[in-house]
Amino acid sequence: MTKRALISVSDKSGIVDFAKELKNLGWDIISTGGTKVALDDAGVETIAIDDVTGFPEMMDGRVKTLHPNIHGGLLARRDADSHLQAAKDNNIELIDLVVVNLYPFKETILRPDITYDLAVENIDIGGPSMLRSAAKNHASVTVVVDPADYATVLGELADAGQTTFETRQRLAAKVFRHTAAYDALIAEYFTTQVGEARPEKLTITYDLKQAMRYGENPQQDADFYQKALPTDYSIASAKQLNGKELSFNNIRDADAAIRIIRDFKDRPTVVVLKHMNPCGIGQADDIETAWDYAYEADPVSIFGGIVVLNREVDAATAKKMHPIFLEIIIAPSYSEEALAIFTNKKKNLRILELPFDAQAASEVEAEYTGVVGGLLVQNQDVVAENPSDWQVVTDRQPTEQEATALEFAWKAIKYVKSNGIIITNDHMTLGLGAGQTNRVGSVKIAIEQAKDHLDGTVLASDAFFPFADNIEEIAAAGIKAIIQPGGSVRDQDSIDAANKHGLTMIFTGVRHFRH
């Protein structure tokens, strides 16, 4: 009995050669619409789908393969006599191979001119139905959804006249992943359209971006996936201009870097990170000076760090950066001279280019945190804050220079691991206390780090001070200005201590925990 294949694809790459090889192996080919036209034009003889179903394609192509003559031919179990007899009684011919890929829904909704009606018309119904029918019956039917599998299938058919069960099972698994991801994109689109903020089912889909050597530690397996609807301002979408593949820890650090720099738009700024904590932030009227400040903030921790700059990197800045061992540099652009400097004798230095003009769109994406047996979902911590809404709670008002420094410090503290304390002046960070289990411990660490540069500095805390002992430590160090959220039941104790020492203190009303 002649074997039959059904081919209906939107992605026609390689399909003509594939179909020709099938014909050479003695297969009959059923085809539909544009695929049939393409194969006929290439001289590949095909059977029209309506010759199989007995019905014409109708309703602008919405109905063409949803028919018992198709799905009976796909679903009939070859090892079940009752199935084969039912097929014979109803003049249903068996279909042994299905090659289908789906309407380009993802590509359609990514178009800038997309309309709701066009999106709906690009929801494939018949394609997923055929794929699922064939995949369910993979014991007998081979199903192909990816042109990358054409060669494997043809090779096995040529060698043995059929594919192996292992291949059919693998391809079926691929189909179910593919159709699940396809439906997830449709669900995400409709959920967005109706404004559903808390869906009872959460299905998100990602595509494999990079197979990784290992995860956070060598004993951990890891891979990097990119959101199926890509975010332009993301490490997954970054253009890599030089260097080795990014590691798991590189990606985590680089992601933290591009989040931090979003808050520093008004002036040239450089941020240096280690272990997802900013160890140096510098701000100036030009990027070279901003680099100087970021480097001076912590010239020890910068070794092996990640650097992000929010302006084009010029040759002068690159010359200063080049002697230092860095893991990653991220910027919106690089001059030709700067790139030449960076790549000279530094083939492993990872250089990434990102579209900083897409930052705003990246801020609306939800954050997902895995826990054992569950998933936490939250908005990003990107609340808009206006200093005019802040409250000076002490008798002394901040000076103009202190006010500028306090705004800078408040931006910087947002990405320090809690309990987080940062000491800055108006253009650079000077001391960092991160990740301590008590706040006064973080205060002491930050003061110790900044001890030789405390004149004219300010201090920011990511959450309220639970006790006035923090204020006593700060005052003893000579720091004169504090910014914190407030909100402790003992706020008045802290205010009284600040007034006693002549400090100025601002409450922002916004907490910035980071775990």
UniProtKB/Swiss-Prot annotation:
CDD domains attached to this UniProt entry: IMPCH
The keyword rRNA-binding is assigned to this record: no
Superkingdom in the source lineage: Bacteria
Pfam families from the UniProt entry: AICARFT_IMPCHas, MGS
EC number(s) per entry: 2.1.2.3, 3.5.4.10
Keywords: Hydrolase, Multifunctional enzyme, Purine biosynthesis, Transferase
Pathway: Purine metabolism; IMP biosynthesis via de novo pathway; 5-formamido-1-(5-phospho-D-ribosyl)imidazole-4-carboxamide from 5-amino-1-(5-phospho-D-ribosyl)imidazole-4-carboxamide (10-formyl THF route): step 1/1; Purine metabolism; IMP biosynthesis via de novo pathway; IMP from 5-formamido-1-(5-phospho-D-ribosyl)imidazole-4-carboxamide: step 1/1
Gene Ontology cellular component terms for the protein in this record: cytosol
Biological processes, Gene Ontology terms: 'de novo' IMP biosynthetic process
Domain (MGS-like): residue spans on this chain: 1-145
The reaction(s) this protein catalyses: (6R)-10-formyltetrahydrofolate + 5-amino-1-(5-phospho-beta-D-ribosyl)imidazole-4-carboxamide = 5-formamido-1-(5-phospho-D-ribosyl)imidazole-4-carboxamide + (6S)-5,6,7,8-tetrahydrofolate; IMP + H2O = 5-formamido-1-(5-phospho-D-ribosyl)imidazole-4-carboxamide
UniProt-recorded Gene Ontology molecular function terms: IMP cyclohydrolase activity; phosphoribosylaminoimidazolecarboxamide formyltransferase activity
This protein's domain notes: The IMP cyclohydrolase activity resides in the N-terminal region.
Family the UniProt entry places it in: Belongs to the PurH family.
Protein name: Bifunctional purine biosynthesis protein PurH
